[in-house]
Amino acid sequence: MAETEAGENRIIRRGPYPELTLTSILVGYVLGVLITISMGYACLILGFSHEGSELAAILGFGVLRGILRRNSIIENNISQTVASSVNGASAGVMFSVPALFILGETDFNPYLMVFGCIAGGILGIAFIIPLRKQMIDFERLTYPGGVAVATVLKSPGAGVHKAILLMIGVILSGTVAFISNVTKFENWALGQHIGMPDYMNGIWFVSLLTIGIAFIAGKGGLCFVIGGYACYWVLAPILARMNLLPSPEQLQVIAERLGEQNLSMPKYLRIVLFRPVGIGMLVGGALTGIVLALPLIVNSIRSMQSAAKTGMALSKDEMPIKLLYIGIIGAVIVLGIVAVTSVEEMGIVRGIVMAVLGTIWIWMAGVILSECIGRTNWSPMSGMTLIAVTILIVITRGLGDRAAIISSVMVGAATCMAMSQATDLMLDLKTGYLVGAIPRKQQIGQFLATWLGPVLMIGLLFVLHKAYGLGSEKLPAPQGTVLASMMRGILEGNVPVYKYLAGAGLGALLSTTGIGGLGIQVGLGFYLPFSIVLTYTIGTILRIASDKIKGQHFSEQVGIPIAAGLIIGEGIVGVGFAIYYIITGMQGG
């Protein structure tokens, strides 16, 4: 020990700093569980969430430095890598598996689904590792998300302060969510009190989580907000002015035909018009994003060729290539078993074909998305998932609707999980590159956490569906609904084709503007209940005002940690109440 001028004891370290330690892994697991539950819950509400790495880095400082008094930045980097690997399932699973619940196909084998997602995650990591040196060391792709996390890690004092602010957000959001659940006050009908017409839908969703997500997204969320306002504050008044909205009597008849009770005008507009158009916009925007990413796809292929020529995979900085081969072969075998046994109707040949195609798609998509997110900080994951499941459902179409849906989503979820893990690892490796971490140890940490996310998310989906219902007003699950609508359209052909096509055209047009994901963002505004959009607006305005009045530094150092706490607090309380509802329901019945 040494004594500073202030009289404080300071540890003098000799030898290497701790990095891949049991403490870093266990802390990463705990933080990963917290973040994954929160982000998974947020994803079911908004259709998107936030990268878990920055939250994990902030929380990691609070635990490792603030509580455990450990001072290694690279140990926190490993903890953050492990936590974000667990959180990879929040997008990987939430973008795909909810479609089964929305379609009513809940009798699938959850254990097979978990093993399939784990196999997909392993493949995604193993395929992308050989490209690390090419993409990060040589091409120097920016990976803005990874740079942001490195900035947090390089400011250890600020990291502890941010952790305290985050806990304040957790307590505030958790308290509001608890009161909201106990009192059942989940929406505030402000529009009725100020005389707003019913069709303008002046109802606010009571959710600090939504405000937190919006604050973190900042100006990037404006397009999402614009989509919602275009529906209810522009198009709806125009329809009313032209006398194209149904009368109360007609609305009652429509409600009986749709099987809806208490069908309000805003709900009618959403079900009949805005939601189908929004689904079309999501599909059109996602697929156009793939087309626009073709130059990046070419760069990805060149990166693979360069890596092969220079023997990048054999670098001592990476995991041994033989271990990667073993992992790939083992994961492909598991994926094949999952595909063959996913449903009774599945034959061996068809199942093997699905597994092989899924593996090829994982390899291609993981590289493509890693290139996209490295250059633009945006990846067309939803579009890649839609394409994968479309190919799979065409292969399984002759098995019958139920079998085709379940088997396609099982393999499709594995591909989605792989894409999520590949992009997450590259972001973390960029962070490690900037703080001096050893890539091999980060890669081991990523592998060690791949199993936990799918276990957590599949279980969470069953809990939330039983308590609230996936696809409901409380948990709209936009990405899962889009996937479900697409599968239903392929198998049954009973879809509002013209509305979907109109939306797809609009989404494609918006996506060509050069603003990454614009068609998808505006489409989400069309699709989601306007109450969520209104509340989201508060967070967007707060971020813009904070940047302008207090400065961007204040927003990043104070605002974002509090906003992250708002996400975690409500997410944990929401899941806690879901478990409570199920237990009390069982006891009561």
Which positions does each model-derived feature cover?
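Alpha-helical multipass membrane-protein architecture
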Residues: M1-G589
